[in-house]
Amino acid sequence: MSQEIWADVLGYVRKNISEVEYHTWFAPLKNLGVQDGSLVLGVRNSFAQEWLRKQYQGLLEDALRSLGAQHPQVSFQVLPASQDALLLPSDPPPAPISPGRAPAPPPADNRKTLNPKYTFENFVVGPNNNLAHAAALAVAESPGKAYNPLFIYGDVGLGKTHLMHAVGHYIAERFPEKRIEYVSTETFTNELINAIREDKTTQFRNRYRSVDLLLVDDIQFLAGKERTQEEFFHTFNALYENHKQIILSSDRPPKDIQTLEGRLRSRFEWGLITDIQSPEFETRVAILKMNAEHNRIDIPQEVLELIARQVTTNIRELEGALMRVVAFSSLNNVPFSRAVASKALSNVFAPQEVKVEMMDVLRQVASHFNMPPDVIRGSGRVREVVVPRQVAQYLIRDLTDHSLPEIGQFFGRDHSTVMHAISKVTEQLGKDSELTAAVETLRRKMKGLEDEDSRA
């Protein structure tokens, strides 16, 4: 593929994503041409290869389609190390060491301050955090070059610390010679106080000013601490001038941190400021699923969904709720169920009305009638398929706020067909004992009052 066409592809992509995403994932790509009818793009590593394939292959194919390609195909190829180096910006020249600066200590274990549980591999990406994740990965790929400093803010328990440690692990893996230091602002302050008291400020400064990556959590606690702000200001300058990467986290953006010196606030805004929001339902379910798999817990999808609907605040509470349900099930020797989960969480989280979605109903009906959901939504007209379809449409109308046209669209039918199905089920209730029992059982399940495996 010519570079002109490739430039058009990138132009299309750039219009449809954020600048952070573009510079993180697309700017480094290498056009390797067309092979066997597929556009082949060179990437840095297998992580980027898999991420691009999952997240952006469709966008690239749309770009090719917009340029006239009939059946566009895109593949990603990991480049050899020698070619990979061509994708990264060259290292900036190191700043001269100031006269009298103490020599850096010899390299130590560069992961000693990192939590081994927090890596990119077990960080669940969703719409609430995709930009922060992309920025963190860009920094990990090119420390000191991409965004410096990287400032991540958001409420407690949303994954800021996880991302910071993930960057540390990634850099430690790729650059074992790099010195990495993670510290909370409270610890930094306490260590400074001790250093002043014991006349060890030189050692303190050398420790934090000789690192290649400095990760500082809860930087908002610098507010009001004049001596700590003064020390951190000079630490920041020393690292920045030597092109060392700085990542900061906070519960608010720099402009909202009261009693923070203006010179620090302006420096915090030099790089990229990105936030993490509370995860939406699908991301919460994915987080629970990953946590359960990591701990080798076999728990039904519907139970995970109930927990995700019940706990909407932050990830820590979400994971805590999962462990509470697991403990409740184990201690009471009862299998996992929606009812068990509701009871386990009832004394901790305020009960919330569970919002039932159309797919929830379809899934339950499919399970009850032992039939794939796609078959129920399909065009089959035999009684074995029609009855479950009518029951699903009846329950969706009964348990959700969706209109007849919306239900019809979900099933690929018009609203009059749905109206007929609902009337048919309504007419048979009380007459057909088998149908009545099925509807009542499914209704109780959807309200979380009964589970197909057990009852609490």
Swiss-Prot record:
Residues 79-112 are annotated as: Domain II. Residues 113-329 are annotated as: Domain III, AAA+ region. Residues 330-456 are annotated as: Domain IV, binds dsDNA. It is found in: Cytoplasm. Plays an essential role in the initiation and regulation of chromosomal replication. ATP-DnaA binds to the origin of replication (oriC) to initiate formation of the DNA replication initiation complex once per cell cycle. Binds the DnaA box (a 9 base pair repeat at the origin) and separates the double-stranded (ds)DNA. Forms a right-handed helical filament on oriC DNA; dsDNA binds to the exterior of the filament while single-stranded (ss)DNA is stabiized in the filament's interior. Belongs to the DnaA family. One of its GO terms (cellular component) is cytoplasm. GO terms for molecular function: ATP binding; ATP hydrolysis activity; DNA replication origin binding; lipid binding. Residues 89-112 are annotated as: Disordered. GO terms for biological process: DNA replication initiation; regulation of DNA replication. Residues 90-108 have a biased composition (Pro residues). This is Chromosomal replication initiator protein DnaA. Residues 1-79 are annotated as: Domain I, interacts with DnaA modulators. The keyword DNA-binding applies. Coiled coil: none annotated. Domain I is involved in oligomerization and binding regulators, domain II is flexibile and of varying length in different bacteria, domain III forms the AAA+ region, while domain IV binds dsDNA.
